[in-house]
Amino acid sequence: MPEGHSVHRITRQFARNFVGRTVLLSSPQGRFAAGAEQLTGHVMTDARAVGKQMFLEFDNGLWLRVHLGMYGAWDFAGDIVMDATIAASNGRMGQTNQRGTDLAGTDLAGTDLSGDAVLDSAGENSLHSIGAPRRTRVRMAEQETLRQAQGPTEDTFPPEPVGQVRVRLLTETVSADLRGPTACEVLDPAQVDAVMHRLGPDPQLDDTPEAEQRFVDTVRKKPTRIGMLLMDQSVVSGIGNVYRAELLFRARINPHAPGKSLSDDTLRALWRDWAHLLAIGVNTGQMMTMDDLDETDYRLAMKNRADRHWVYKREGLPCRVCGTHITLEEMGARKLYYCPSCQA
């Protein structure tokens, strides 16, 4: 399931390519035909992410809410203008392990990025230039990959829909196809406010002391295990399985500890670390959770998922700190990774 950093990055692409433009909506699959009819032909005025959900506003006052869930993903095609943080980072755009095309070039400041490529061991390329728009196809979900369009799609725009496309958004130059979401619906402003009110704070949107205090107060009231609370989107927005495991290890917190047993200071530090890791994820496209790496180790970590986490998917392997074997168990029907010694 895409975690919060991915949804923020997708939203930035909508902000760069759709906001301020008239958008045509259709539902090639047919399931969203009525919703598409309500929005088509209107100007997109805002693109906003809250945790794992995205909200796109149109000039008729209606919003499109999308939650990708476990299997949802966006495919972009056309003359795409890459968001600067995506283009200049070691991020990837896509859900599959397709080999990308390295895009050598410059960033917005004119810096040559052609020598900075870091190839992922799964065959995914980094994205290295924003420059002039390129005719590309981009798939954005939990992991990110860029590939140049091949075959007829190089010369044909918009491309023919492929698979079960719930909704297509189309401008004169860019299209975005949504497949497999958990939620795709049209909301009015009151309904959007109601959904957002149910969501916990997201440090990418609100890093104020008030947001931090809201998180602390919510957790301190609950007897629920902290490993469950971090996955509860009404407590804090955007955290998924990877970030849960890594945040708890970095804080040396037992995932079974009741929320109300944790001190204010511990929870404040946890919130601030989440803000720190989320910012890294948004800016790089990677759930990089290891700090203070030298250049060699950093490049290895960007290439290989196994080298960028403390405990996630390291069950049975020795803890990087104490040597105890990492434990895997289920919590809330999701896999939980932790060190039984460091997090005792």
Model regions and ranges:
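Structured catalytic/nucleic-acid-binding cores of DNA maintenance enzymes
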Residues: 1-344
